[in-house]
Structures are given as C-alpha cells and as structure tokens.
Amino acid sequence: MGLSTTHLIIFLVIIVLIFGTKKLKNIGSDLGGAVKGFKDGMKTGEKTEADAAAAKAAEPAAQVSAEKRIDTQTIDVEAKTK
C-alpha cells in the first residue's frame, strides 16, 4: 500500500508537466541558495558565540581588578569612630 517506483515516476512526470523544467530549475537553484545562506549564517553565528564567550570570560577578571582598586580606596567610617 506504499508508494512504489511507478507511482513516484508518474508523480514526477505530472509535476514537470504542471510547472515546466525552467520553473523547476529556478526553484532548485533558489532552494540551494537558501540552504547555502543558512549554512553560512550558522557558521557566522558560531563564530559570534565564541567571540562573545571569550569576551565574557575576560570581563570578570577586569571587573575583579576594578573592585580591588575600589576596595583599597574606601574608608570604613564606623571603624574610626569606635
């Protein structure tokens, strides 16, 4: 009860008769271009994520050193009054 080879061939012939070979060629090239664009976008996204992770890893170190500088300059007012 499944699709046999004969059914698939008849289906493809009907599709070619309805759309024509030129239109099918255009659809195929458009689909190929879309797939290529998607793959390129995924590669760019991976690079961007890696750059963001590296920047995020470097950020806490800079933040800690800034906090240490602030801590050395703070004065505990309550300690002086006691």
UniProtKB/Swiss-Prot annotation:
Topology with respect to the bilayer: Single-pass membrane protein
MF-aspect GO terms: protein transmembrane transporter activity
Record's function text: Part of the twin-arginine translocation (Tat) system that transports large folded proteins containing a characteristic twin-arginine motif in their signal peptide across membranes. TatA could form the protein-conducting channel of the Tat system.
Subunit structure: The Tat system comprises two distinct complexes: a TatABC complex, containing multiple copies of TatA, TatB and TatC subunits, and a separate TatA complex, containing only TatA subunits. Substrates initially bind to the TatABC complex, which probably triggers association of the separate TatA complex to form the active translocon.
Localisation per UniProt entry: Cell inner membrane
Biological source species: Leptothrix cholodnii (strain ATCC 51168 / LMG 8142 / SP-6) (Leptothrix discophora (strain SP-6))
GO biological process, one term: protein transport by the Tat complex
Keyword terms, alphabetized: Cell inner membrane, Cell membrane, Membrane, Protein transport, Translocation, Transmembrane, Transmembrane helix, Transport
Gene Ontology cellular component terms for the protein in this record: TAT protein transport complex
Pfam family, one: TatA_B_E
Regions that span the bilayer: 1-21
Species lineage: Bacteria, Pseudomonadati, Pseudomonadota, Betaproteobacteria, Burkholderiales
Primary location group: membrane
Name by which UniProt lists this protein: Sec-independent protein translocase protein TatA
